[in-house]
Amino acid sequence: MSRTDRVFLAFLIASVPAACSTTQPPNDRAVCEAYSAERSRVEVVADGTVTRVLGVAPGRVSPHEGFLLRLESGCSLVVRVEANTDFTGRIGLSEGQRVAVKGEYEYYPRGGVVHWTHRDPRGRHEGGYIEAGGRLYE
């Protein structure tokens, strides 16, 4: 293997973790602030503990899997999280499980909802994810 090949291979190996790492550090405070200000359409990254699994229900366009998430820091808010199973597949969460989510927060008085927790195939919306059990659902 030539020196050029070794340098290229080293560069490629060093680049893979950065390219594969799509998660962002959670900022539960952003969710708490959006809730307090009654704001919607706020892109958030949050983490917490699943307090209730709502299961899969038919949505307006496609089925969604829902669960309630108690935020880990910032405030003790419980938000509903919805995942479009056409994109993420079934996640299969359990109560007490730690989860991180990225999506769009929508206010409502009982805590709000985080949706768009998946990629947008049309590219019109920022993609989201759910990270659970060491696996990333997009």
Description of each model-found segment:
Residues M1-F8:
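Bacterial N-terminal signal peptides that target proteins for export
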Residues C20-E138:
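OB-fold and OB-like single-stranded nucleic-acid-recognition modules
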Residues L9-P17:
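Bacterial N-terminal signal peptides
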